Design a protein with these regions (language model features):
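A generic "functional-site adjacency" signal
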Residues: 39, 46-47, 77, 182, ...
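Short, solvent-exposed recognition patches
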Residues: 53-56, 60-176
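N-terminal Lys/Arg-rich, disordered targeting/topogenic segments
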Residues: 1-2
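Alpha-helical transmembrane signal-anchor/signal-peptide segments
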Residues: 29-46
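A short, solvent-exposed beta-edge/loop patch
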Residues: 6-14, 18-20, 24, 31, ...
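Hydrophobic/aromatic-rich, well-ordered segments within soluble, folded domains that form packed cores
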Residues: 44-59, 185-192
Length: 230
């Protein structure tokens, strides 16, 4: 081996070691969830609010139970309830919370979970929800299973922002990562068995507005992030 070759290899090795050390130094290690009040979904989410009351005759389920082991790894807590209004209209609420939204642990989107359960994804649109905390983006799905139609509205909070899509999510993760922090994440999903999509989405909007308004002020940012219009 000539001196030139040896020197080149030494420089390459030194660069690799430096890059490895830099990557390790920049790797986020502080969980945002550990710095704030602990999350307890069962006590945070009221069982009665506005015209909605929890239905004691049954409850909704987190979709995709075959992947329970994976879901348990991704989420620290999940909550599933069914609420009804005085006219008997039922809305299913599912909330999943994960304290670690790093690359290896990602929130499970309904676009993935529903088809895994045998549902057909008929449409997907992105709109907004007007909540007591401000306006946030929300995703609306139309899913079907046989003759059953289930319109879905959901939104995802990563750290302190509502995100739509993987690019927005990654940007929020990078912002936290620059400070050495790992953001937490929450996915809030409301759905109903209803063949009339427009009616379903309107009632889901009303439900979400009432829900957020009934949650204690100190917990609202967990559900809705920092609103985009403030």
């Amino acid at each position: 081996m000539t001196m030139t070759t040896w020197l080149r290899n030494a420089i390459i090795l030194a660069a690799m070691v430096a890059a490895s050390g830099l990557a390790l130094a920049l790797k986020p290690t502080i969980k945002v969830a550990d710095a704030g009040p602990k999350i307890n979904l069962d006590s945070m989410i009221p069982r009665e609010f506005g015209e909605w009351r929890e239905a004691r005759f049954g409850s909704s389920q987190i979709v995709d139970p075959q992947q329970k082991e994976l879901l348990d790894k991704i989420y620290n807590q999940t909550l599933s309830r069914t609420y009804v209004n005085p006219r008997g209209y039922a809305i299913m609420l599912s909330i999943a919370y994960g304290s670690d939204q790093s690359d290896g642990l990602q929130l499970h989107k309904p676009e993935v979970c529903y088809p895994a359960q045998g549902f057909q994804l008929q449409s997907r649109t992105v709109g907004t929800l007007d909540l007591p905390t401000g306006t946030i983006p929300a995703t609306r799905l139309m899913t079907t299973l046989g003759s059953c139609s289930e319109p879905v509205t959901y939104w995802t909070v990563v750290g302190d922002r509502v995100v739509v899509g993987s690019i927005q999510k990654k940007l929020v993760e990078m912002r936290f990562g620059m400070g050495g922090k790992i953001p937490d994440g929450m996915l809030i999903r409301v759905s109903s068995i209803d063949g009339q999509a427009e009616r379903a989405y309107a009632l889901q909007n009303q439900f979400a507005e009432s829900l957020v308004g009934a949650v204690a002020v100190e917990h609202r940012k967990r559900l809705t992030g920092i609103s985009q219009d403030k």
